[in-house]
Amino acid sequence: MESRTLSLLEFPKVLDRLAGYAASEPAAAACRALGPMGDAARLATEQRKLVEALELRRDRAFEFTAFPDIEPLFAVLESERRVLDLDALVALSHVLSRVAALREALGREEGDSVLGAIVYRTPWAKKTQAALARCLGPDGRLKDESSPELFSVRQEIRSIHQTILTKVKEFISERELGPLLQDDYVTISSDRYVLPLRANFKGRLPGVIHDYSQTGETIYVEPFFLVEINNRLQELKNEEREAEARVMAFLTGLARDERREVAASYRLLVDCDVLWAKAALCDAFGGTLPEVAQGRAVRLLAARHPLLALAGPDSAVAQDLELAPDQRALIVTGANAGGKTVCLKTLGLLAAMALSGLPVPAGEGSSLPFFAKIFVFLGDEQSLEDHLSTFTAQIRHLSRVWPDIDADTLVLLDEFGAGTDPSQGAALAQAVVDGLLDRGAYLAAATHFPALKAYGLSREGVRAACMLFDPATKKPLYRLAYDQVGASIALDVAREHGLPEDILERANRYLLLDGNDTGLVFDRLNDLALRREHELEAIAAKRLAEEGKIQKLKDNLKKAQDKLVEEIRELSRDIVRRHEAGRLGRKEAQKALADVRKRLIDESNELTGGPGGEAAAVAFDLSVVAPGDSVQVTSWNKIGVVREKDLKRQAAKVDIGGVSLWVNVADLAPAAGKPAKAGGGAVVTPTASEAKGLGLVVDLRGMRADVAESELLAFVDNALLRGHGELEVIHGRGTGALRREVHRMLKDHPQVASFAIAPEDRGGDGMTMVTLK
């Protein structure tokens, strides 16, 4: 894409803002080098990567911090004779450690993760990273353990240091030299241990003078007894440097052997830093990723100019920039300084950003065609050097790019045809738009030409729009109204900017004389458009309020239903407990449960306004339902399991949350394949022996221990009342934690006779078989 186009759209400024979110200088440079892609498949991949980066960044799965630019290191690694210095090795170690952390974070991504796949495919400098981590300390120095030679020589250096400190202390003490010294310590000068002697005691301490302090008050003297030790220390220092050089050569060799892996890892880190910067930019202006594909319509919802959006939430007015699938052109009209040019630049800039794999400040559901080319005719393009007027410069530019314009092109025309005779300029502008449409190109044009305004309303495939203004103040509102044209209100703009009133009155008289005063008509159109916008906003607000009320009613109904279910379950448990304690006989318990079920039905109908009626009964055929099938109880909006059915009564006995009750067919509906959940939690289904009244199965997989305990107790209680002797509890394998909790609960339950892990063909250690007393 032409650099001229990107410059006119201020695309480099967006890249500068993007670069500000990068953690490293290499990534910032990569951000500034981004541009529109010519490959739709590559763009789709980049968008998928950005979607994953947004999720990872928001989940704080990986945090980017600054890392050095190691690009110059690769030239060193290409030469067999060159060795990386310590600073270069530290920089390389820092980069590879960040890559290791990135691999750890992104390597866990599973399934269709694009980033996870990229990390998996990227060659990894495993040996180099491990060796650098082993040899380099947190202070940036080579560790003693880097090599046996380095360890040995440093041990001796430390030993000599201790020897010197001991000898100096004894020397000062024996000679009572404390008052002669500036400080009671040994220091280093010229890489040798010396004593800081006061200048006025010069000659009192035999030795070699190495240096003077800046004030001249201190003389640094090496006592003769330290000369031999210092000489040995210098030898060891040389040996240390040689040992360090051998370690650095070894590490350089490893990096050289793995230079392809090092380079790939570094590129991965930089690329991901760029991705995280894109994600940060997206969050900064509340953006999204539009769908970009051949044949998609221009649809940018709540679009804002990115530079204005980044300036603050109130700095940009959101616009819906839309064309129908059969439309290719947008003609924007309205007042000077009303926002027409910003509207065009927003469309072009957001298209360039989307084609570059960047997020755009627009709403969800936005889309764009895949533009291979964007051409811009924007603002004052006159060239004094080439002796070209604005009109001539635009024509020359259009002539140059005209052969390249096709169906994959977006053209932006700002006041095209201005700067010459108005009638000829308008005719030329219409002809250019015709030619662009004939080539299948997309275009957006801003104009003041009346002929082009009428063209926008009458030409098939073209949509007209105008920038609205406040009728009272004549100031622009920077809002776009579609399918109408607007006035230029040049006189009002001139008045706003201080032109003398007598000139404006004279201009108005000339308008009346020429018969060109259409201001009242356009004012009326603007008022109607503004009223329509306000009405649409009011309707949207009213709908939102009504939806809120409906949702609140639904929430209240659900709370009431849940509360009632919990009360019924507690009553049922109380009946079971009294029956187990012998305070209630079997028949009395069954009657009490029947009363509870009746209360459940009555209060359910009261909450929901009664059963569903005849229509529901017709819609649901009870004859095709079998025991064990899942159904929806519409009056409760709950899924239950059919236990029995009575075709004569047109009712079914349904288990909901461990409570069984007869439900009229009018209150039943197909469950759409959803599993039934007891109490909104455990899935309860019959076993093969259910028809004989021998067993039930409950599925507790995925539940927390406290929820599973509640569901299991209710399940066992219900089974006891119904006379079941054998149960199956599905808890899954997993870590075994839920199985242990289930076994603990069963062990403590007074009505459980025994339990054991199911045979392998019935579920193995993922299921427990239970026998009740």
Curated annotation (Swiss-Prot):
Homodimer. Binds to stalled ribosomes, contacting rRNA. The keyword Transit peptide does not apply. This is Endonuclease MutS2. It comes from the Bacteria. Coiled coil: none annotated. GO terms for biological process: mismatch repair; negative regulation of DNA recombination; rescue of stalled ribosome. The keyword Lipoprotein does not apply. Belongs to the DNA mismatch repair MutS family. MutS2 subfamily. One of its GO terms (molecular function) is rRNA binding. The gene is mutS2. It comes from Solidesulfovibrio magneticus (strain ATCC 700980 / DSM 13731 / RS-1) (Desulfovibrio magneticus). Pfam families: MSSS (PF20297), MutS_V (PF00488), Smr (PF01713). Keywords: ATP-binding, DNA-binding, Endonuclease, Hydrolase, Nuclease, Nucleotide-binding, RNA-binding, rRNA-binding. PANTHER family: OS10G0509000 PROTEIN, OS10G0509000 PROTEIN-RELATED. Endonuclease that is involved in the suppression of homologous recombination and thus may have a key role in the control of bacterial genetic diversity. ATP binds at residues 334-341. Its EC number is 3.1.-.-, 3.6.4.-. Residues 698-773 form the Smr domain. HAMAP family: MutS2.
